[in-house]
């Protein structure tokens, strides 16, 4: 659904919301704690990609949530940094 030279975005195979998309860097970074200061432009780019995809999915006006999990207690299950984009319904706070 989105790809450029630094990132790609695709639908989650086990969605937790009507819109549940993963935005991932092409660079191998295990998790947010492993990102280096040199990765700051890439991390910002992931957020920009998420906003672009949210507009494409038509959820920009109603709202969406971005999540990065770190560690098992947070629900991290894939050892590659990724941003979850959730939307398409009202999202409760606090989550979980």
Question: At which residue positions do the language-model features occur?
Answer:
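HIT superfamily nucleotide-processing domains
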Residues: 1-96
């Amino acid at each position: 659904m989105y790809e450029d030279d630094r990132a790609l975005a695709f639908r989650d195979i086990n969605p937790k919301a009507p819109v549940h998309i993963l935005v991932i860097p092409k660079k191998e970074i295990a998790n947010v704690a492993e990102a280096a200061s040199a990765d700051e432009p890439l991390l910002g780019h992931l957020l920009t990609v998420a906003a672009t995809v949210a507009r494409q999915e038509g959820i920009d006006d109603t709202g969406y949530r971005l999540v990065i999990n770190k560690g098992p207690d947070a629900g991290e299950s894939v050892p590659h940094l990724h941003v979850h984009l959730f939307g398409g319904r009202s999202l409760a706070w606090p989550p979980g």
